[in-house]
Every structure is written in C-alpha cells, then in structure tokens.
C-alpha cells in the first residue's frame, strides 16, 4: 500500500509525531476488543479481498516489516539489470517473508504468492515498450519475465504457489496479457496452457481471445521480425497442443478440471482459424495484405516441421480429416447448377495458390485411398461447397497418379447406383467429378469425351439395361442443357449415347434441344473445331482461329505418324461444312512453296491423293502459290510477322520453371513441387497454343526423322526451355541430395512433357544427341541422361517411335530410341556415347538402388548398356582385364554432377561397381560377340579414337582372347572358330543389308558394302577362314574330299530362305542386294571355298562345287548375271579355284575336263560366263597352267578357245570355219560376239547362218531372244534395241526359210533334257517369264504358211497370248516398256498395250484358218485362263466344235 492510503489526522500517529505501523495498530485493536471467532473469520476474508484488490507487495512489505523491508522490493528481484538484484535478498528470503505475511493475515501462502506473481506478470506485459507487436514481448520484458518465472518456480518447488488461483488472477488482467507470456508460463511449467484455458469461466470468450492472438501471431511471423524464431516456436507449440488435446480419443485431463472443456476450446480455435482463412480466400484476399499473411502463415502450420513432434499419427490424421471436412462443407452457398456452369474456372492451375498449398499439405498425411473415401463420405452425408470440392478433385488427380483409377472406380459405382435407383445426386456428382478431373489434361485423367463415349457409346453402357434407364439419362442431360458449356453440348451431339432404334426419339429430342441451346448461344455445331479443348477459359473460339489451330495440330500429327489423322478423315465425311468452309481454306493459304517439301506440302498432297481436296480448290491454291513465287517482293510484303503472342506465355513458362528450380535446393519446399509442375503444364499448353483435347489425338506411333529432325520455332523454344530447366533442376537437386533422395520431381516433370510435347521432346533429343552430342556440356549430358532414365521408367505409357532409316522399320520403345540416337563411329561420338551411358547407368543405379535389378534394367534399353560395355573394352585396356573381388568399387553420383566431371574415372568406377557387375549377369544386357561385331562395323577408321595398330590389337583381343573362348551362354563361341566365322559373316550381312552402312556414302558400289570401315573386320575373317581351311586339310585323310556343306553356303542358304520370295520390286531388290554381298564376301576369301582344296577321282565333284553350282543356278542366275553371264570377278575366282584344286590332284588335265564337262549339265552358266570373259580369263589360266604342267590346256578349256575363235571367224569377212561342238556353246559364243559388233556390220555376216547346223541356229535364236529381252529390261544396255530386233528377225527368217521348228523354245520345261534343262539354267527366270512378250514382238516376222502349216503353232500362239495378258494384268510388262523416244523408232512393237492388241487381232484372224487338228489341246489352255479374253476363248471353242470348212481360201490373209 502507498503512503497516501494513511491519513495524517488519524490516530495512527503517536503524540511524539512518530507514525505507527499497521501491525501496531492491529495489535492495539486486538487488545482493546474482545476476541470474536466469527469476527476473526470475516477479518481474514476482508484481508484476502484487500490483498487481491491491492497487490503491491512492495508497499505491503513496507507496511508489515517497517524500514527493514524497504530492501525487499520485488521489482528489484525481477529487474535483471539492477545491480541490487539478488545481491542481498534470495528467493528463500522472499518466500519466508511471504510465509510470515500469510500467517499474520491468515491467508494461504499459495494464494498470496499467486496474486503477487500474477500482478507482476501484468505489470511486465503493460510496461511501456516498443509495443508494435501485440503478442510478443520486448527483449527487456522477456528478461524481466524470465527472472519472475525463476522466482515462481522456486515457489512451486516449495509448495508456496497456487496454480488455480494464479490462473484466475491472470484472466482478470486478460486485456493486458500477452500471448508470449502465456507461452512462457506453459513452457517453463509454471502453469500449462491446458490449465489456463480450462480455468476461464467463459469458453467462447477464451476461444475468441486465442483466435485474435493467433491471428496477430501469424501476421507477426510473416512480417519477418527479429523475434521470428520465438513466434514460430510459439505457434508450433500451440498447434501441437491443440491437435493433441482436441483430436485425442482418450484425453489425459486432470481430475480437477472438466474433461470436455479443453477439446471444445482447441477445436473451436482451430475451426475459427480455418474458417477465417476460407472466408478470406472466398472474398478475394489481396496479395501481401495482412489477411493474406495470416492465411499463408496459418496454412503453413499443416506442414511437417510445425507438426513434426506429434508422436502419434492418429490425432494428426483425425485433425487433417476434420480440416478436410470443414474445407469441403464450410459455407455451401453454391448449387450443383452453379458448379456445372463455373467448374472450368476451378482447375488446379486457377485455384488460389494458398488453397492448393493447403491441399498438398493434407495429402502428405492422408493417402489417395483415404482422401477419395473421405470425399465420398462427405458428399454422401453433408451439404458441400462445390468450388472447394471440385478444386480438391483437381488437386487430387494432379498430385496422386493413382487417383485416376480410384476416381474412375468411384465414378463407376456412382453411375451404377444412379441408374439402379434413378439417384439424381449420384449422377450429378459423377458428372462433375469426371469433368473436373478431365480439366487437368490427359496425363492426369481421361478426357470427358472419351469417358462419355466409354460410358454411353456402346451396348454395355450404364443406360442400356432398360427404358427407365434411358429416360433417366436423357432427362438428366436435358436438365443440364440450360447450364451446360457449349463444349459439353458439342460432345454429347458428336458422340451421342447408343440408343436402340425403338427409343430413337429420346435421342433426337435431346439433340434438338441441345442444338437449340447452341443456337441461342450463337455457337454452330458445324463450326466446331477438330481438336477442341473442354478446359479452355473461353466458351468458344472463332471458327477461323480454331481452324488455324486445327491445321497446325493436324500437320503435327501427320508429321509424327506419317498418316492423315483420323480426326481429319472423319471431319471430311461427317463434318464437311466445317471441313470445307474453314479447315481447307486455313490449310490452303497461298504461300511461296519451299524448295524442299515440308510437312505442310506433304500433308496437302496426301489429302489430294485421298480425294479430300476438291480439284477446283486445289487448282486455285496452286495458282496462288505460283503467283506468290512470281512476285516474291509482294509476297514478302504481304506476309506480316505474326504478333508474338507467345512471348507472354513464354515468359510465364520461364517464371514457372524458375520457381521449380528454386524449390530444388529447399527441402521445406518439396511438397509444392507437384503443384509447380501442374502450373508448368498449364503454362506449356499456353505457349504451344494447344487448345485441343490432347487425349483425343490419335498418336499410336510417333514418326521421327532421325537424319533430318525438324521442329517449329515455337516448339523449339518451349522444348529447349523444358530441357534446360530439367538439366538445371537435376544439378541443383544433386547439390543437396543424391538421386534416391530427391523425391518424385523428375518423374512428375517428365510426365508433364510426355503428356504435352513428347514428339517435340524426342525430336529435340534427336537433334541434340545424334547431331550435336559431342558439343554438349557435362550438365547437359547428365540432365539428358537422367531424362532418358525417367522416360524409360514411363515406357509402358508411351507410344512407340518409328525413326525410319537407318533404324529398323518396326516401332521402337522410347528407351531403345536412345540406343539409336547414340552413334559409335568417330572419336568424338565414341567419347560422347561413353559419357551419356556412364551418366544414365550411374543415375539409374543410384535412383533405384533399393529396387530390383529388373527395375534397373527396365529404365534403360539393353542396347545402351551393351554400348557402354563395348566402349569400355575399346577405350580402356584396364577393362579388358578380369576383375577381382578387391577391384569392386562403390558408386557415387556426386562426382558426376560437378562441373569438372572426370568421365574416365567415373566410367571405371561404374565398371567395377558391384551392382553393375550383377546387372551384367542378366542375359539380355550382356555384350555378346554378335553385338560387338555390329558396333565395331560402324566405326570409321579414319576418325577412330584408336590408331590402326591399336585397332588391330583390340580386334585380336576381342575375337581370340575374349569372345572365342567364352561360352555360348555368355555370348561367346565356345572356342569354335567356325562358329566365330559364322557369326561374323552374318553380322557383315546384317550390317550391309541395313541402311546404316550407307549413311556416309553416295555410291555403295565404290567400296565394300558402301563403307571403308569394314576392311579390318574383313581381314580378321580372311585370317579365320584361312585357319579353318588349314584345319580342314589336316582333318580330311589323303585321297578324300570333305563331304559336308561349307559353313558359308549354309549361311547363304538359311538367309535366302528367310527372305521374302516373289517377283515384286522390293523382294527382288532385297534378294539382289543380299546376293551381291554374298559375292563380295566370297571374292575376299580363298578360292578353295568355291571348289574345295583338291579333287579326287573317287569324288571328282566336291560338295563345295555342288553348293556353288546350286547357288549359281538358283540365285545368281537371276540376280547376279547379265546377258547370260556372271560377272567377271566371280567367274575368274571360280576358275582360279578350279585350277588350284585340280593341280593338286594326280591327273590335273583329266580333272579339269571332268569338272567342266559336268558344268554343261549342272551349271552351264559358268561356261557361258567364261566365254564372255575369255579374253581376260585366258592369259591368267594359261600362265597358271603352264607354271605347273607342260601339257597343253585341258580339252574342255580348249573348247572355250575354239568357241571364241569360231565366233570371231564367223563375223570376219573371210570364210567361216565349221562350228565346234557342242552347238549350244558355239551358239552362245556367236551370240556374245554379235553383241560386240555394230549393227551395220552384222546383216551381211548373218547370211552365213544358212550354212550352219540346225541345232546351232535354234540355240542362237534363243540367246538372241534373251538379248532382246535384256535390251528391254536394261535401260543402259550396250546392245541397241533395234539391233536386237534385227538380229532376232534375221535368225527367225533363216529358221523359217530352212523350215526349222523353233516353237519348242517357247515351251521349255526342266523335263526337256535336250533344250529345257540346259537353256533354263542359262536364262534368268524373269527372261523366260517374258518370252510371250518376245514372241509377239516378232509378230511381223512370222511366215504366213508356217503359222498354218505347224500344227503346234496355234497352241503356242494362244498360250503366249494368254500368258502375255496375265503378265500385263500383273504389271510385269511395265519392266519392258520402251523408254521415251524409242516407241516411235520401234513402231509400237515395245508398247505392251499395242502388242496385246495386235496379238489379239492376229489370233482372231488365225483361228478360222487353222486346221481342226490344231485345236486338239485348246481345252487344256482355256481350262484355267479362259476368262483372260472371252472373245478369243469363244472363237477357239466355236472353231473347235465346227466341222472342217473346205472353203478356207476365202478368208483374208493374215500377213
């Protein structure tokens, strides 16, 4: 008490003027008055009231103790800066004084001390200070409070303090009580927050007080003050206590308090804060306003660091579930009809970021199944706020990949319930949920159009069970019409429900209603774009603008698939008004056409070929383009640069990518990554101008030009931004954590790219990896390698890629695409491939270290892992050594992401890594001998990283030390040299059949296989085959020959059997190319491969000879011969081998004669080939023979000499010598000689044929026919076509003059031992098939009498005519059509149509003149070909049935 409370005139002052103490006054009164117990009790109560009303303990002590207690000032106890603090007085002294005072007053010491401390707390909170922070203490106040609480702890420890009384006293000063002071009391154990709150008499008031203070605290935290740490700790403690006490099933409350109060208060406070935040967001809170700061801070309490110390997850889950319920149900002001109209504005990207951040924090604790189940429960039991419900659905499908299936299942149940009992609520919910999820794009959920078609577009639809269900569906759809967006109405009209015919009126009524609504909205269903987007902000796009977007998208789909999009084809039929009026004009905009046709030109031409562009419109377009080319200046002026409308979206995309990158290094921001990726997806769509529903784009296979990848500028910029961002994000994330602890950001990022721009991303990757790889920096290599891994992770959801040549024609999965993009040809490409493979494999092993090897391998193609092994063997000699257990190394991703990455060290570390060594045990990723050969064949020696010597040493090691001894199960050869040669030859053939071998050569005939890079491999093959030949000589006993098939011919036979048979151009070219490669390989190997090493009398024709003869007869005759002869190289090679083998026998001359005699029947083409090349072949054979034998050439070789000499003499002016035997050989020699002589010198010499033998003339006529057909078939033939005609005509004239039958040449069969077997083995099959063409080409030279005289002539003529017609129908006569400029010269004889016409007229005139016996076999001819020409067939049948007519002389002449 102060001194002013004691009046001067009172009796408290003695006569001497001394002022008496209050104790003396009280004592005096006690002495004067008689003790009264009742009065004493009242006095005690009054004293307590007085003490509670006036809590100035300092004054009280002064009054009680007098001058001695002036030093007992409590203000000095709590004043930490006072030099007198605790100098003379301890807590025990003050406590003793309090006890004394309490005993004098008759008041419990706990009550007295509680009132004193509460008063001091109030004084500290109201002390003048920088009170800009209404909930936090200043530094000075905090120090004073700390001292006071130490004193209070002493009192508590000595049972001198009443908590309940203290709480009651505190609430009396509630207006001045600061929240931080309450927190300190709680933290230091003076009084818990629970006790304090439950002591308040008014629960609503205390909730309001806490709410106000928490709002102030949140605002204070967002202000970034110097006390932020304290504020953050306060908020965390309060929220944790609220959650534990409010959402714990069995609250551990004290017996002295009511157990219901605390949960009520805490739940009330939490609910007040959430409702305040939701209302603020609904009202449109301003950015950086105080309210915005409060909401942002409060939503932050749902993160892990705020609630991290909550041990049990059950209260936390109950709290989050309760919060979600409040979010979904608070203030349900919107109706379902409002949701139908407005839900497009509630997509994830358009929802307020604060609300989406709250959703994401709730998702951390609750699984997708729990969230969907909770949403279902809330919708079934309570009124909801549709905006927040649907924005929650959007967040759910964006953040949880598995949510799509969960929502689909739930919607399916809703639809089943709706149609089962006509529940309108279930129907509305299902439609709203599906539409909302579809707004988030194809990577999150299927499109609404696809869902609607799947649900109602078939007989299995929900509506197909009964008429009641149909009526319910169309009633529902009709009720939606006034609220529907035009987009949804268009979907319902274009993809209507499947309805039985008898209920068709229900559908037509609805469509009429929907079209009326669209008309009211001034939207035409005919003008709807081909690629519509139901999530676009606007209701409708102008038809012209939509058409431009449709054209761009259609061209993009065409470019990536190579086919006209199905959407365009459907529009050309079912939506023709829009297609003709808008799409085609937008597509056919006149422009200066590029010199190299681009995708737009190719697309237009494809539509033109498909008759999808009206001729008049196409003609107008071509004229306009021509006019633009003629006036380039005007065209340039007319083409204005489009306003760069993509700049703003591009900037927004850049900003969104920057925000994502900033989150990479902040662990606290991990929960916002999925939202940021969703925003990036939205920004990306805006940049690319994709206003279509991406999921409706029918890209089942991506078409990618691997050699000339091209991108539109807008796509190029967007994809570069994405790839750069991915690489930067990876580097940023790797600086903080290894790949396995970086979270799902990369997978989410890649999924966004796959959903929006996968074709463009793959095209850009093709440009970077295949064409610019060596110039990429280390961060780019690492980033793109990680991207490849994550694309492989999503392989099952990605379409295949058709890269065209040089890759196989079949579609490739995306991981295998990277194998095609990484080439190993030059030094630079080898080292780049090593870097990329090292980075990709290392990242995969780190990222999925806790998963199985199957998962590791599934993310990368086996080809990429094999290339890494190939490069390690090739570039590092250390890798060729076997590994020991001590060599096994650990793998770290960290050195790779550093700027100065040591790739060699990283590669060797990966090579010796234990897990990688385990992966290599998998059969499909282990580098085999065949894999090694395919990769080695691609190396360009002139640009190789190895020198010639190093490359040779490497080949020797790889073949003889590594793959040859390795087991076949591990990809080796089991030590079998022949198996090694077989695999090598197959690899050579495979490589040269693929177009990879022609990438760098204009003319594939210049070098072996079009490449010089194979020479070293061919040298290894030569060495290995030479070794095999030596082994064979050692194995076969003297006097015997090997009987088994040579492995090379076995390879050729198997490969030829696998090729497509037939006479199509493609099959023929493929077979010809294969045979040319066989021939080149044979020419590089010893000639003994063709004939064997020696001939023996017991078995003169070796198995190898037989195999070579078969190869010549069956294949080379058709594809490797020209004009009846093989090429010079293979012919000379055979004869060299023949002499070598024969010279090793006992009688070389006899062996040569025997073999060549057998050739006449087994392989005559070899002899005709020798005749052609004899001038160059003879000196070589003669020199070799004379070197080993003194005798003249063997007789069969002399026959070849004589045949050539006869031909030369025949064409000389002198008299010709008689033709040697055999006749066919002399005829062949004469034919080849005639081909070398000019036409004017031939006519006179051919008159000598009258003196030649009949058989020679017949053979010569056949060879001439072959020459005639060759002249037709070969455009650059050295034989002039008129000359070939004249030669054939001259020989035919001679035959007719001498009445020699030649018709058998057009009826050759293998059973004909005299002509057929011989000539059919010389002429290619194509020539014999075209004999009908040759027959009727000589029609004008047929003799009239011979045609009637020869009984077989009509049969042959009809047979040739029917075969000619069949050839024409099959298109085979196109190969013999004359080149331009020659048809006039040939007088129409080479034109198939004219030829057939003349042949037909000839037969119709011939048939009536032929005798009855000529028709004996007509029925056989017409049995299966009578329908080729009904008129000719009828004439034949009519003449066959008629009686012989004696007056045949009245018929007109045929010739």
UniProtKB/Swiss-Prot annotation:
Effect of residue 1088 to F: In FANCA; benign
Pfam families: FANCA_arcN (PF24783), FANCA_CTD (PF03511), FANCA_helical (PF24781), Fanconi_A_N (PF15865)
Parts forming coiled coils: none
UniProt keyword terms in alphabetical order: Cytoplasm, Disease variant, DNA damage, DNA repair, Fanconi anemia, Nucleus, Phosphoprotein
Any one GO biological process: interstrand cross-link repair
Endpoints of the signal sequence: none
Processing after translation: Phosphorylation is required for the formation of the nuclear complex. Not phosphorylated in cells derived from groups A, B, C, E, F, G, and H.
Effect of residue 1110 to P: In FANCA; loss of function
Domain of life of the source: Eukaryota
Modified residues (Phosphoserine): 1449
Subunit organization: Belongs to the multisubunit FA complex composed of FANCA, FANCB, FANCC, FANCE, FANCF, FANCG, FANCL/PHF9 and FANCM. The complex is not found in FA patients. In complex with FANCF, FANCG and FANCL, but not with FANCC, nor FANCE, interacts with HES1; this interaction may be essential for the stability and nuclear localization of FA core complex proteins. The complex with FANCC and FANCG may also include EIF2AK2 and HSP70. Interacts with FAAP20/C1orf86; interaction is direct.
Disease field: Fanconi anemia, complementation group A: A disorder affecting all bone marrow elements and resulting in anemia, leukopenia and thrombopenia. It is associated with cardiac, renal and limb malformations, dermal pigmentary changes, and a predisposition to the development of malignancies. At the cellular level it is associated with hypersensitivity to DNA-damaging agents, chromosomal instability (increased chromosome breakage) and defective DNA repair.
Purpose: DNA repair protein that may operate in a postreplication repair or a cell cycle checkpoint function. May be involved in interstrand DNA cross-link repair and in the maintenance of normal chromosome stability.
UniProt protein name: Fanconi anemia group A protein
Gene: FANCA
